[in-house]
């Protein structure tokens, strides 16, 4: 019972979870005030509306990759067995197109003390979208409090961004433009 207020607060901040919706609804129907608060919060979309607003301007340093960077450049298929370990898998991001990318991004962060914006001509074509976003955000994103080995945020600029990669980047908490 002592954890109920903390659990309710955290559940309100999650995107509606179909895995636990029925459990929360049943508790709500039985008069549980915490479950009622969660249901109301989900119905109002507070998991989204309570997020910080996008700032008027973003100061960052640019890491530019010319040409087409596809999902295999961000998440090489031959290393698919490491995808579950995001920090490890992110180390091999860049593949043949920009093999020193992770080091160059880190060097830019260290030199300018600014977040790095990834810029490409064509970004995110291919099929390994989520692992590609995970790898890229590991290098340009920010830690998610209390969620180990996962990051969100970061700006991705592209003359063309593959539509499904664009959506996946948004869903991952990035700002694709």
Each language-model region and where it sits:
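Fe-S-dependent hydro-lyases/dehydratases of central metabolism
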Residues: 4-5, 9-177
